[in-house]
């Protein structure tokens, strides 16, 4: 792992494996794990709402999104932190490594169904509706298209690897991270000089 202060963001849609990866990174490297989804779930519980109800409530109360974003940005000021959230890569612009995890929706629905003890069909409908609402909300609130992956340094389809495989890929990326932030520039300087 490069020496110094690392800030890593991990983003992805429901069931893509972001929480598992972040827990593994936090355990292996001793990183602090900041989880926007947990903040969101806690706020829903505090208000006595289901996630679906709270999702609709948040659409009418953008200050909730802004508070979650503020907490992520504040957390990025710390050293050796992994920040998990759908918009973490967008919010933490100066992150050393921005990761997006993805998988086909049916694969994600199977994972969510298993995790939440519901049918795959129910999970599929919940995921599809939530993603539609989130995409609209992010576009309206921030002008961010969640489907734009151009800001990410590493994109992994987690349907191809289990948690250990995904961790191994990300670990290799972290362990070989260029301290200058631009490995291509270092190579050009060597070639020219």
UniProtKB/Swiss-Prot annotation:
InterPro entries: Cyt_kin_arch, Cytidylate_kinase_dom, P-loop_NTPase. This is Cytidylate kinase. One of its GO terms (molecular function) is CMP kinase activity. Keywords: ATP-binding, Cytoplasm, Kinase, Nucleotide-binding, Transferase. The keyword Repeat does not apply. Belongs to the cytidylate kinase family. Type 2 subfamily. SUPFAM superfamilies: P-loop containing nucleoside triphosphate hydrolases. It is found in: Cytoplasm. It catalyses: CMP + ATP = CDP + ADP; dCMP + ATP = dCDP + ADP. GO terms for biological process: pyrimidine nucleotide metabolic process. One of its GO terms (cellular component) is cytoplasm. It comes from the Archaea. ATP binds at residues 12-20. Its EC number is 2.7.4.25. Transmembrane segments: none annotated. The keyword Kinase applies.
């Amino acid at each position: 792992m490069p020496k110094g202060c690392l800030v890593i963001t991990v983003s992805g849609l429901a069931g893509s494996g972001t929480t598992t990866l972040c827990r593994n990174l936090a355990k292996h490297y001793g990183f602090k794990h900041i989880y926007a989804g947990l903040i969101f779930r806690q706020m829903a519980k505090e208000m006595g709402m289901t996630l679906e109800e709270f999702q609709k409530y948040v659409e009418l109360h953008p200050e909730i999104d802004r508070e979650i974003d503020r907490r992520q940005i504040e957390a990025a000021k710390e050293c050796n932190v992994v920040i998990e959230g759908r918009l973490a890569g967008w919010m933490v612009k100066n992150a050393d490594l921005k990761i997006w995890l993805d998988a086909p929706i049916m694969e994600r629905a199977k994972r969510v169904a298993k995790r939440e003890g519901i049918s795959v069909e129910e999970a599929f409908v919940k995921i599809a509706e939530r993603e539609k609402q989130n995409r609209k909300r992010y576009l309206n609130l921030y002008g961010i298209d969640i489907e734009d992956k151009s800001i990410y340094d590493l994109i992994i389809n987690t349907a191809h690897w289990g948690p250990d495989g995904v961790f191994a890929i990300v670990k290799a990326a972290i362990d070989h991270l260029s301290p200058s932030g631009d490995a291509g520039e270092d190579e050009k300087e060597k070639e020219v000089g």
